[in-house]
Amino acid sequence: LKNAFVGAASSIRIKSDTHYNQLGYDDNTITGVTVAAKTPGSYANGIRISIIDSAADQILTVPSGNTVQVGTAVTQTAVGRIVSGAGGTSVLDGYVKGIVTKSTDTTLEVKVLSHVSAAGTVTNVNYQQGGIYNFTPSGLVGLTTAGSAVVFNGVDVTYTQAVDWFERQEVVLTSTDANGNPLKIEWDAIADRPGTSTYAAARGGRFDELHVVVIDDKGKITGNAGTILEKHLNLSKAKDAEYSVGSTSYWRKYLATVSQYIYGGSEPAGITTAGYSIPSNNTLDADSGWDQDADGVNFGVSGVITASLGGGTNYG
């Protein structure tokens, strides 16, 4: 008798909520398991799970043959951009800085981190589609290898297009339409983009938010393939996070309490660093793991993780 799960572990068995607590999973992560079915047995095999965080803000299209490494700092002049505030408007100098969180032959997926003034003052900023702190629809960006200070006569790359990352994220199902194509659900039809919670921001943390959906992929439960069984939105990677006093938003604790179908186990494999511990020389943050308190943490990112529960077995 085993629970269906997503992850690299060989198997897992959690008999009940009481057993979950007895195993210490209420306080400790489950190694090698991203999510697990609430009760053991084969019934949960095939349930589709999708998790999304704010892995990137924009996708830049660059010339074929791109070899830029994940973690590279990306900069672009901000000179002349106009910022509106309560006291009127001001004109920016300096540059916008981001970090590469994924790199392909023709694209750079980039997360916006900060504005650096001409005087060298670093201010954390948040991307907003069509806003001030982003990379222009096309143009030139500077590239600086992680661990090196930004220089203005370094490596540049011209890109032909910058598109919104979140708008292009989908939940891909194993069920297909009449033409044999996989059914897909657009993430922006499910929820607003995740980012940084108010709780984490107040403690100097960033990028803790995530969404989780549970889907009846084959229609085994509802009779309708692709039905969303549960939506858990604006959860947090931070262990101490709360929506309000006494109301947890920590993803594992929240799912253990609220979800009918799944427990949260531990961060997905292969999370990517989304910040620098020393911005002046772009030293990658080495303490970005999920499932720790929010204070001062730039939480690592995973993008979209979509998988089917499997490995659940009955007696015999």
Which functions belong to the PLM regions below?
Residues L1-G316:
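Surface-exposed assembly/interface segments
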